[in-house]
Amino acid sequence: MDRIEWGSLPPTLHDAVQDHIGPVIKAEPSPEGRRSALAATVHTRAGQRLFLKGAPIDNARSVGDLDREAAIAPYVTAIAPELVCDVTAAGWRLLAFDYVEGRRANYAPGSPDLPAVVEAVTALDTLSCPDEVPLKWFDARWSTYAADPRQLAVLAGTAVLHTDLNPGNLLVGPQTVTVVDWAMASRGAAFVNPADLVLNLIACGHAPAEAEAVVHEVAAWRDAEPEAVDHYARTVAVAWLQAFWSYTHPWARAVVRAAQHWALYRMAR
């Protein structure tokens, strides 16, 4: 998605946002939040730092992501930043979150970040939200890629899922790990959260067996039927191969390779 900087947004949008947060004196583009036209850290005159993300309201997909993120925000504050304001003005939808002091997690084999990352993923299993919160159904999201109906059945459930646990979405701070970017939040089987981490660990250099060992103490993973994990790995491999084959972004290519590697490992067990 083409990016825009804070200073290039319509003045009426600036005014609408600043009505909530006060005057902005500095804005720094963020390298994260690739699905948003705007992703920036802003500094206010009062000394506050906030993370802003937004998109034009005529971009239905991006606005849908923002809708989900705003809807789930009140229910994930135990491990995610608080939503400060939600603004629609001048043809834009904009969310402002508390700024998180932290760096992207290091998922490499042997990384000292891994225990805290696993703790954060374990905490996902404690989350819940009302039925009316408009999250995606995980099994429906992947229905295009499942060759066998059993693959979809094992993905269904009511657990709150993040579904994009790449290292840029887990920020390591002095005391804790914060999980950001809930645009793809879904409901589904609880084991999907640790399984998503496994895929991302493989993309960062772990062998499949090593990645699975990292999450072996996570209850949602430990309680999952091996066949369910097999179906997940197979479905994800097909999805990434079909949907992201043409993507040139290095991370997308790494996950495409990781998904195939993991599926073949599960098949050979």
Predicted features, each with a name:
Residues 9-20, 123-163, 173-174, 178:
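An alpha-helical support segment within catalytic cores of ATP-dependent transferases
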Residues 17-45:
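ATP-binding glycine-rich phosphate-binding loop
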Residues 196-269:
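Helix-rich C-terminal or lid/interface subdomains of diverse kinases
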Residues 164, 169, 181:
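Conserved catalytic-loop position in the HRD/HxD motif
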Residues 57, 102, 168, 177, ...:
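Activation segment
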Residues 41-47, 99, 173:
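Active-site beta-strand termini and strand-to-loop segments that position acidic
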Residues 173-213:
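Active-site Asp-x-Gly
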Residues 35, 48-91, 95-98, 103-124:
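A conserved alpha-helical element in kinase catalytic cores
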